[in-house]
Amino acid sequence: MAAFSKYLTARNSSLAGAAFLLLCLLHKRRRALGLHGKKSGKPPLQNNEKEGKKERAVVDKVFFSRLIQILKIMVPRTFCKETGYLVLIAVMLVSRTYCDVWMIQNGTLIESGIIGRSRKDFKRYLLNFIAAMPLISLVNNFLKYGLNELKLCFRVRLTKYLYEEYLQAFTYYKMGNLDNRIANPDQLLTQDVEKFCNSVVDLYSNLSKPFLDIVLYIFKLTSAIGAQGPASMMAYLVVSGLFLTRLRRPIGKMTITEQKYEGEYRYVNSRLITNSEEIAFYNGNKREKQTVHSVFRKLVEHLHNFILFRFSMGFIDSIIAKYLATVVGYLVVSRPFLDLSHPRHLKSTHSELLEDYYQSGRMLLRMSQALGRIVLAGREMTRLAGFTARITELMQVLKDLNHGKYERTMVSQQEKGIEGVQVIPLIPGAGEIIIADNIIKFDHVPLATPNGDVLIRDLNFEVRSGANVLICGPNGCGKSSLFRVLGELWPLFGGRLTKPERGKLFYVPQRPYMTLGTLRDQVIYPDGREDQKRKGISDLVLKEYLDNVQLGHILEREGGWDSVQDWMDVLSGGEKQRMAMARLFYHKPQFAILDECTSAVSVDVEGYIYSHCRKVGITLFTVSHRKSLWKHHEYYLHMDGRGNYEFKQITEDTVEFGS
C-alpha cells in the first residue's frame, strides 16, 4: 500500500472522481436510450420489422454461431483464393512482428552508439536500418494488399450468395409484398454487406497482430525482467477487457438502428427521384421536403446519441486501454531496475542499464499497446455483431421465402366477417396448383390479398386456349389480384388452380418495363442473345415483330439492334406499349395477360395486335374499358368490388360497358 500511496494525490483523486461521474452519466444515458425505445409510439417510415423479434446484437455464443455460418459462405473450401489471402496476411503479420522486434533492437543499438560516441557503431547500425527499409516497406504493403483483396473476395462471395437467394424465382417480389420482416433490402445487400466484410477483415488483422506481438514480447520480456511482469499485464488485459466489453454492449443495437435509419433515408430519396414527375404535377415539393426532413431528423438525432455514446466510451477506452496500460507497464518494467539487490543488474554499468531498460521498456510499451489494441478491438467486434445480426436475419428471411414461408401481419378476419356469414379461415399455401397445357381453371379459389383482405370468397371459371376473356370492374375489385394469383406471385389460400407452367403465361402491364441493354434486349427480354439463337429466331424475324406493331422505323432511328440507350426515357409511352407487344409475339406464350397495355395505342393498331395474337394462337386475358375490344373476346369476367362476380359468354345480346 505504501508503494501506491504516492499516486493518491489531489489531482489523481479528481481524475478518478471525473471518471466515476462519467461512468454514472454513461449508465444513465444507456437506460434513457432503452426507455426511449420502449416508450416511443411513433412508427418509423417503412418500419415493417416485427417488434419483439428484434435481432440481438451482442458479443455472445449466438454472435459467434452466426459469424461462423457466414464465414463458411465466404471461405467455402479449405483450399481457395480466400484461404490463400488469409495465409498471406498471417505470414505478413508474423514478418511485421519480427520486423518490429528487429527495429527495436537495432534502434537501441543506434542510440547506444550515439550515447557512447562510437561513430563506427552508429554508422554500422544506421546502414543496417537503411538496408532493411525496402524489405520492411514491402512487408507492410503486402499486408495492405492482402487485406484489401480479402475484403473484396469476401464481398464477392457473400454478395453472390445473397443475390442467388434474392433473385431465385420471385423472392425479390415476395420480400417486399408478402413478408414484412425486412425493410429496405437494398441497404442490406449493398452497404451492410460491404461494411460487414470490411469489419471482419479488419478484426482479423487487429486481433492477429496484437496476439502475435504479445506472444513474442512475453517470451522476450520473461528472459529480461522475469515472468511476473508479463503475467501482470495479461491479468490487466482480462479485467479491463471484460469491463469494457460490458460497457460496449449497446453499440451493436445502435449500429442496427443506424443502418435501418440510413436505409429509410435512402428510400425516401429514391422514391422522390422515381416519382418526380407526379410530384411536380401536384406541386408537392413542400410536402416531400417535410417527409425528407422528418426522416433525416430522425437519423441525425440517432447519430447525435451515437456520437455522444462513443465519446463517453472513447474517454473510458483511452484511460483503460492506453494510459492505465502504460502506467502498469512502467510499474512492471521498473521493478528489476529499482530493486538494488536484483541479481541481473548487480554488476551492470550505467550504459548497460540504460540499454537494457530502453530495450525492455520499448518491448513492454509495444506489448501494452498490443494489449490495448485487443481491448479496443472489442469495440469493433460489438459493431460487427450489429452487421452480423442484420446479414443473418436477411439470410433467414431469404431461406424462408424460398421454402414458401413468409410472415406478415394478417388482419383479423373475424373482424371483417358480416353477421350471419360464416368466416372461413385463410391459410397461405392451402390451395393446390395443377400444371396443365391450354387451360386455366379456378375451382373454389378464394381471391385474397396476402394480409387477409378477401376480395372474392369463391371463384369458379374455366378458360381453354382460343377463348379470349375480357376482365372488367371498378378499381380495387380484384383484377390485378387475380393475375398475381395466376402468376404465382401471391399465395393460393384454397381451392384448385389449373394453369400452364410459368413460361407459358406472359404478363404485359400498362407501364412496360424496359431493361438495361440494347434495342434487341427490349424485344427478347428476359431472354439473352444466346437464348434467341437457341430458339432459332433471327434478327429479321425480330424486325417483323416490330413491323407488326408499327415500330419498324425505330430500328433505323436508334442505330440498329446493338444500340444501347436509356430506353425508359428514349421511347414514348405508346412506343413502350407497342414494344411490350412485340416482346409478347417473340415469346409466343399459350396465355397472355394484357393489363391496360394498349391505353396509349391507337384503335387501329390495337385491333391489328389483337388479330395477330389470335392468328399466332395466343389466348388473351384483357383488362380494359374500351368497348372496341369486346369483339376480340369470347367471354367476360365482371367483378363488382363487393365480393361478387359474373363470368359469361359474350353474345350479340351482351350489353357492352366501357368507353
UniProtKB/Swiss-Prot annotation:
Region named Interaction with PEX19: 1-61
Chain positions recorded as ATP binding sites: 473-480
N6-acetyllysine modifications at: 61, 260, 399, 533
InterPro entries: AAA+_ATPase, ABC1_TM_dom, ABC1_TM_sf, ABC_transporter-like_ATP-bd, ABC_transporter-like_CS, ABC_transporter_sub-D, FA_transporter, P-loop_NTPase
Domain of life: Eukaryota
Modified residues (Phosphoserine): 659
Protein name: ATP-binding cassette sub-family D member 3
Name of the coding gene: ABCD3
